[in-house]
Amino acid sequence: ADRTEVFMRSEFMVKRETPVSHTVCHEVVKVHARAIARRTFREPIVRKSIGAEVTGMTACPCAQNIMKERAMRVLQGLNVDKHSIDAFFTEVPMATHNQRGKGFLCIETDDDQHVDLSKIISILKDSMSAGIYELLKRGDEGHVVLAAHKNPRFVEDCVRQMAKKVLSEFEYLSGDSVVTIKQTNEESIHQHDAYAERTATIAELVDEMNGENRNADE
């Protein structure tokens, strides 16, 4: 055969602690790996990939802004001064609707390059509004909800964050390494779900990020 492929799917148990009570719990992360070898006249060409799917929580920025505008009108009507209103919104983010987010990240590289699975999992978790846990005490629950509402993100925001974090964590990878990013947010107030994805080489992502930085400076 001129081409050989091996593919693996598995479930990876991650030990975690809740943010306030430090209760130990576990999370199941879906992981997969693939290797493809092609025969050549010299050494075989091997490409490999590793990826994971992680579940988290997102909070909608749009609905939150609507609720903030409403709350601001009420506070102004009660003659609350602007400084106090700003301080209130800093400490107490407004209500919004939430989604259960499913992030997917896969990186394909040459055989001689290493991609740390734990970094992939961390990138996925950190790219959503907040992480979720199997077991939460009351203090933990309040912390998670507050963290999510202080960090609202659209589905496309999650994909952008993953791309930026990949470049930060895996800056040593060759430019032809291929990054596949997907995010699905299961909507709570819509009949549909929100979805975004991006597939690009490391070199393409670097060019895109440099373009964003140039535009921000102008």
Predicted regions and their residues:
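N-terminal intrinsically disordered, cationic/polar leader segments
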Residues: 1-218
